[in-house]
Amino acid sequence: MGPGRIERFWLDTSLILRLLTNDPPELAAKSLEVFRGAEEGRYILRVHPLVVAESFYTLRSFYQVPKQEVSQALRALLDRKGIEVLEEEAVYLALQEAGSGGLSFVDAFLSHSAEAFDDGVATLDEKLAKRATKNLP
């Protein structure tokens, strides 16, 4: 690491889930400490779209949180200072669409990623095929 370069850490789903669910409280407190460190500028937390997808799915399926609430909570968390989201535009659009529409986060992310490259989507999923600008088969 060169002088003046801030350290970066890749964020794992476990920290997101603990912070958003407060389950269990002692791990939620540790997670909050990690996020505070990023907010204070001690380091940057990088978030991969796969981590967002796993978080969305787990909050919906295991914790039974309504999709709109999941979308809003994840967006608020990702908007915090010190957070760097990879493929940010596609992630945010997918959160919005998955929170309000009929597509899963992964399908919405795939669709928005394909559009960003002016590509199509190869799928047998009817909902995704209808959403995609171009598709196969």
Predicted regions span which residues?
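Short, well-structured N-terminal submotif of metal-dependent ribonuclease cores
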Residues: M1-V47, F62-E69
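Alpha-helix capping/helix-boundary segments
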Residues: L15-I16, V51, A90, L110, ...
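Hydrophobic helix-cap positions at the C-terminus of alpha-helices
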Residues: G37-A38, L77, E97, S113
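Acidic catalytic patch
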Residues: R46-V51, S71-S100
